[in-house]
């Protein structure tokens, strides 16, 4: 419905009703010198003018490019039913369901989401989501700090640099000791990580697959951490969890993920959702909403928000986090996506993505001067070292309609010639072949 502003007559009637002469009188309690002299806003536009302006801006978008970008965010196919079901008014307008008697549908959907992600990651408990993968990782670190009463955190440098930047920002005033262990050609340095985990450490924080696409089994590292009474925290890629060793199998205490790859379009970076799971002993440390299943006095199944004493709206001073919202709609989309695909469909999505990535790696490394950054297993994403600048390659091929990947040197000094290439089930073998031919033409 278009916004229809108040007419001068409407404003006059409202001012008369509340007993003032002008709108400025409403702010009489604020000293004049503290009020802004001008808001420096342009003149308002009509609805037609606004639509024309937005259409002109949207026309500048490139929708015809073939993109091999990844770096933590992936263009997987989203079944049309996800949009159709999640846009229903019963879900689309719902927020945190504080009144369970009026929101059983939403509460059950969140409960099923929690169940689904626990099964996917092989963990005991989950919350109703947080904002994104980075905020989930920060909250996981703070869970470890509270649970262990320690302030040292060991972080693998191969963890997403986007997440590491967020963690540095979040923790800048928390008097925590963040120890970043350098990677070795895109691989975690296991010996150095173990050496950094001691009796003062709250948690070791890793990612699988990591930013460079490398797949690693962290079972030994988590066992080592447990021997020092530290926690194992891992960030994972949900789609790949259908075929990889799970956090639960590795012995992780807390597992988080960005849920973008299951049901969320890339959409200029959001909205996404942060998935948080943990082992049962840590459930009272997990932030945000948790939906539980119970029975009413008549024996009927009901869904409620449970363990609310952890939350800010109940005990502000002692809450586990100041997060006071969640991504319920995005969580619903992820639930619908997972349900529509089922276990076999999710495995097939991962296998097709990995198949394309293997083919891409073979084609690209057949070019002169191109080699894989490391020889570790990878899933749907891999890094290659080029004989020229990756930034130059990205600029030249993007201008021709192909985004070849992500230039790793943007975040890692000394790696300007490293290109990170991601594939999903949406990429065809023909597109991969064209990428290889275009890259070969400029090397």
Swiss-Prot record:
Catalyzed reaction equations: N(6)-[(R)-lipoyl]-L-lysyl-[glycine-cleavage complex H protein] + glycine + H(+) = N(6)-[(R)-S(8)-aminomethyldihydrolipoyl]-L-lysyl-[glycine-cleavage complex H protein] + CO2
GO terms under biological process: glycine decarboxylation via glycine cleavage system; nucleoside metabolic process
PANTHER family: GLYCINE CLEAVAGE SYSTEM P-PROTEIN, GLYCINE DEHYDROGENASE (DECARBOXYLATING)
Subunit structure: The glycine cleavage system is composed of four proteins: P, T, L and H. In this organism, the P 'protein' is a heterodimer of two subunits.
Protein name per Swiss-Prot or TrEMBL: Probable glycine dehydrogenase (decarboxylating) subunit 1
Organism for this UniProt entry: Nitratidesulfovibrio vulgaris (strain DP4) (Desulfovibrio vulgaris)
Alphabetized Pfam families for the sequence: GDC-P
Keywords of this entry: Oxidoreductase
Annotated function: The glycine cleavage system catalyzes the degradation of glycine. The P protein binds the alpha-amino group of glycine through its pyridoxal phosphate cofactor; CO(2) is released and the remaining methylamine moiety is then transferred to the lipoamide cofactor of the H protein.
GO MF term set: glycine dehydrogenase (decarboxylating) activity
The enzyme's E.C. designation: 1.4.4.2
Family listed: Belongs to the GcvP family. N-terminal subunit subfamily.
Gene it is expressed from: gcvPA
NCBIfam families per UniProt: PRK00451.1
Enzyme class: oxidoreductase
Matching SUPFAM superfamilies: PLP-dependent transferases (SSF53383)
């Amino acid at each position: 419905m278009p916004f229809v502003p108040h007419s001068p007559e409407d404003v006059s009637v409202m001012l008369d009703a509340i007993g003032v002469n002008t709108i400025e009188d409403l702010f009489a309690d604020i000293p004049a010198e503290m009020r802004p002299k001008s808001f420096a806003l342009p003149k308002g536009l009509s609805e037609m003018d606004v639509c024309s302006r937005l259409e002109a801006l949207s026309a500048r978008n490139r929708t015809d490019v073939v993109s091999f970008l990844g770096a933590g965010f992936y263009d997987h196919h989203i079944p049309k039913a996800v949009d159709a079901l999640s846009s229903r008014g019963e879900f689309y307008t719902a927020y945190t369901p504080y009144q369970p008697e009026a929101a059983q549908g939403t509460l059950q959907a969140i409960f099923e989401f929690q169940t689904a992600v626990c099964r996917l990651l092989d963990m005991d408990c989950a919350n109703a989501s947080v904002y994104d993968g980075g905020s989930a990782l920060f909250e996981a670190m703070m869970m470890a700090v509270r649970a262990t009463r320690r302030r040292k955190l060991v972080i693998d440098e191969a963890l997403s640099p986007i997440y590491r930047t967020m963690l540095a920002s979040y923790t800048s005033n928390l008097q925590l000791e963040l120890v970043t262990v350098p990677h070795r050609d895109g691989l975690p340095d296991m010996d150095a990580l173990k050496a950094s985990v001691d009796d003062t450490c709250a948690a070791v924080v890793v990612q699988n697959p990591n930013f460079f696409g490398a797949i690693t089994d962290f079972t030994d590292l988590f066992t080592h951490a447990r021997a020092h009474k530290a926690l194992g925290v891992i960030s994972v890629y949900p789609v790949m969890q259908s075929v990889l060793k799970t956090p639960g199998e590795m012995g992780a205490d807390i597992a988080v993920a960005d849920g973008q790859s299951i049901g969320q379009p890339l959409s200029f970076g959001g909205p996404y959702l942060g998935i948080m799971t943990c082992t049962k002993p840590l459930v009272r440390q997990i932030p945000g909403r948790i939906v539980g299943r119970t029975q009413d006095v008549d024996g009927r199944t009901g869904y409620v928000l449970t363990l609310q004493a952890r939350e800010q709206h109940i005990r502000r001073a002692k809450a586990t986090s100041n997060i006071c919202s969640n991504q319920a709609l995005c969580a619903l989309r992820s639930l619908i996506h997972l349900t529509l695909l089922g276990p076999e469909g999710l495995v097939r999505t991962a296998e097709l993505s990995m198949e394309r990535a293997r083919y891409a790696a073979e084609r690209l490394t057949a070019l002169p001067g191109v080699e894989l950054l490391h020889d570790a297993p990878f899933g749907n994403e891999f890094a290659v070292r080029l004989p020229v600048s990756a930034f130059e390659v990205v600029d030249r091929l993007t201008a021709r309609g192909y985004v070849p990947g992500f230039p790793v040197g943007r975040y890692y000094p000394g790696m300007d010639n490293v290109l990170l290439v991601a594939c999903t089930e949406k990429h065809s073998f023909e597109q991969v072949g064209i990428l290889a031919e275009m890259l070969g033409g400029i090397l």
